[in-house]
């Protein structure tokens, strides 16, 4: 990704939470494209994907707390022409799924979006098990993987549309 489109007239939206920007953007993308899929791992409330589930139930799958399997499902959906967006806490969307992301997504050149919420040390309220230091670094080592860490809701919305 050489350029994130839509940021030429950048204005910060300081009143919007990242999860709300995610929810609004995914609702728009779901309306525009039936191939958009949202995959959750029992975190629809914390990731604000419940509205997408209500609006597009056929485009939503809750796989339960099994992040590694969810990456395999995302890869399979991508191989069949869908565009999956997988939501998980950052530590579980990176360290826990590394092998599946490497082989099933990167090595296979598939278009699966893995969204890790509360990346890095940003999830202090959830304790040390949710605070990886290496999350972005290990994902950057995967061939064909693009790692983006949007700083605010405007950047997040732009990245999701790419």
Identify the residue ranges that each predicted region occupies.
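Thiamine diphosphate
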Residues: 1-162
């Amino acid at each position: 990704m050489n350029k994130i489109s839509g940021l030429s007239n950048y204005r910060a939206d300081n009143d919007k939470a990242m999860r709300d920007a995610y929810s609004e953007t995914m609702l728009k993308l779901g309306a525009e494209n039936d191939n958009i899929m949202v995959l959750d791992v029992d975190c629809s409330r914390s990731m604000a994907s419940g509205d997408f589930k209500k609006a597009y139930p056929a485009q939503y799958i809750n796989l339960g707390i099994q992040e590694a399997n969810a990456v395999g499902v995302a890869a399979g959906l991508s191989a069949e022409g869908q565009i999956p967006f997988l939501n998980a806490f950052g530590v579980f969307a990176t360290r826990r799924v590394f092998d599946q992301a490497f082989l099933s997504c990167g090595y296979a050149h598939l278009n699966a979006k893995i969204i890790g919420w509360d990346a890095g040390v940003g999830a202090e309220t959830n304790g040390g098990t949710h605070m990886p230091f290496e999350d972005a670094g290990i994902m950057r080592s995967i061939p064909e993987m693009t790692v983006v860490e949007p700083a605010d809701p405007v950047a997040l919305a732009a990245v999701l549309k790419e």
